[in-house]
């Protein structure tokens, strides 16, 4: 049995011929078949994967970067192999012949299409309690949620069923499950990764993102997807990182607060300067942009997708087949009652989104900051079966709102962000730290993430 490690470590082992690609695949298949209770996958084809591994072993990688590394792709991403179901009944037979561009780029670089990842239905939720494929369960405690909507991909990476994966992120959907499952989640600057071949939620915000075991792996996949040359090691000496205490550090679970402060203390010894500075009006502006834009764009974007692909099911039929009551109610409310009017949507895009963008730009420039750092999620994973509210720190709280609170604001203006696991609570649940930077600062964010990862040594404190 091959010991499953990071993509980067596995590539080194394959190049040294410590084991074959087929050996690697057999280990992943064996682990996956022993972990079906986690519901990580929406679809698999182990025979196809074995054949692909044999092809790599016969022909070699030709020097191509990913050399037969199997990846998991969220079920709303066209692979050309698995149905692009988006986790919903109405698309179970939808199988575009042409893979998404991001799949093509990774496959051209030698990656294998390992599995289709379970997801929250139509990406419209954060628990990944999918009524068709079952709830994706957290490998750290199987009674708990994985987070979503890219939960199956995060589970597959955290449980060593796949070496890495591609999810999608509208407001939190890559970084949230990564944080709850104790792996790395990266949302790039909006527009850096292609979105062709992906079932949409909100085209003005949707982007593919990375879920991997290490920041080194995120750097590797990012370089391949963006077709960019490796960058030289970036000096972090003298970097200024903002700590926006108001909002982002408010009302944290005690163990999350303690773990976050412990990580910050460790990082303070790494020649980086921390600046306590708040982002003004961030909660109010986010509220006026986030859900109004997503809820208004979603039905229109999905109708356009169905029309483009000539899918037999009508939009109404697809909606009637939604299995998740909360997703169904939200979509039906928009369709039947006009939950978000066009005027509210236009005001969000033309007024409040530019204000949010200007607020962030002024925050960085006026404080001389290179990036900001804060807890990825205010709380740890909770039991499967969550309702619309939960009790958080003794107060009944909106479930969706509290889980995405810290991750959502910058997503509305397309900034790059990275969630890195930094600690385990005493009951061994992961806590993540988010690093965000200005528009286009992906390399800087990843470099800081590597420093965080090296300093905190996740999982070794208990």
From Swiss-Prot:
One of its GO terms (molecular function) is hydrolase activity. SUPFAM superfamilies: Amidase signature (AS) enzymes (SSF75304). The active site is at residues 74, 149, 173. Keywords: Auxin biosynthesis, Crown gall tumor, Hydrolase, Plasmid. Signal peptide: none annotated. It comes from the Bacteria. Gene3D superfamilies: Amidase signature (AS) domain. It holds the Pfam family Amidase. Its EC number is 3.5.1.-. The keyword Hydrolase applies. Pathway: Plant hormone metabolism; auxin biosynthesis. GO terms for biological process: auxin biosynthetic process. Hydrolyzes indole-3-acetamide (IAM) into indole-3-acetic acid (IAA). Belongs to the amidase family. This is Indoleacetamide hydrolase. It comes from Allorhizobium ampelinum (strain ATCC BAA-846 / DSM 112012 / S4) (Agrobacterium vitis (strain S4)).
